[in-house]
């Protein structure tokens, strides 16, 4: 941000306040895109900062929406349903029915559990509406479903008349500073997707992968070589057996660098060696 504009804001706006530099944000998105292979497309996790959604709409293919509240925000902003990934561990009947009633059903719904599968199967049957879904594969934590559950769903996929199963979602956490951890996860998911094709004849159209890129917050972390880190991950993606559509879900990694928080000192004192 230009210093003159910064000074103007400080003089005219009461602290505390946030400023989001949209030029910096757009450059960040362009940079991340340039570092990834062509089959990788970005999905912005709205929870990271919902205020910038409309500003980046032309540059982002998908939005991850993990609550009914976020969906209402996206709806008010005029976000196309075709760009929505309806995620989240909690999906209740009232909110899911409202979402199904409001759009043309071009969204993608994630399935975190067998209960969520049965809920959406029930609602779509009643409404005779076909929706797209992806199945979340657990990383071993409380989120998603185990391999056996996903395999069972796919073995019986013909009975889900109104659920178009497009693929797999995988996300294990965030702030992963070692590229080898993400590479290991990509290898695991790649092998699982290949097994689904070979053993069940199920071809994944959509792989949604949350890498959990780290955000540098403190001075001691400034030596993090992000370019090399991203190149190593991109190289792994290029050499995967799966070469279909990959949606890379990112939140803080996209938006963190564009924000500044302004406040003021209201008191000053010294205790021993600390101010």
Predicted regions span which residues?
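Generic N-terminal amphipathic, Lys/Arg-enriched alpha-helix
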Residues: 3-16
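A glycine-/small-polar-enriched, mobile loop at the entrance of the PLP active site in fold-type I
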Residues: 13-22, 42-44
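A short, N-terminal amphipathic alpha-helix
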Residues: 28-36
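Active-site-proximal beta-alpha core segment in soluble small-molecule metabolic enzymes
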Residues: 40-206, 236, 266-269
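C-terminal active-site-proximal or functional interface alpha/beta core segments in diverse enzymes
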Residues: 184-275
């Amino acid at each position: 941000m230009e210093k003159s504009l910064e000074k103007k804001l400080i003089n005219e706006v009461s602290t505390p306040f946030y400023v989001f530099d949209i030029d910096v944000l757009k450059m960040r998105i362009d940079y991340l895109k340039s570092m990834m292979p062509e089959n990788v497309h970005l999905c912005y996790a709205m929870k990271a900062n919902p205020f910038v959604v409309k500003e980046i709409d032309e540059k982002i293919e998908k939005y991850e929406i993990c609550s009914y509240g976020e969906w209402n925000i996206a709806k008010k902003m005029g976000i196309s349903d075709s760009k929505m990934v309806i995620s989240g561990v909690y999906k209740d009947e009232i909110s899911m029915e409202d979402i199904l009633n409001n759009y043309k059903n071009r969204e993608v719904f994630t399935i975190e559990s067998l209960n969520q599968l049965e809920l959406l199967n029930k609602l779509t049957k009643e409404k005779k509406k076909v929706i797209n879904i992806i199945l979340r594969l657990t990383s071993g934590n409380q989120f998603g479903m185990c391999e056996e559950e996903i395999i069972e769903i796919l073995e019986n996929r013909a009975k889900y008349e109104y659920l178009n199963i497009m693929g797999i979602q995988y996300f294990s956490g965030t702030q992963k500073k070692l590229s080898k951890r993400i590479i290991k996860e990509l290898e695991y998911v790649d092998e699982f997707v290949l097994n689904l094709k070979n053993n069940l004849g199920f071809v994944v159209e959509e792989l949604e992968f949350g890498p959990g890129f780290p955000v540098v917050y403190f001075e001691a972390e400034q030596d993090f070589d992000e370019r090399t880190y991203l190149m190593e991950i991109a190289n792994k993606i290029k050499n995967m057996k799966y070469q279909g559509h990959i949606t890379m879900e990112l939140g803080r990694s996209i938006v963190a660098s564009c924000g500044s928080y302004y406040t003021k000192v209201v008191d000053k004192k010294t205790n021993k060696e600390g101010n």
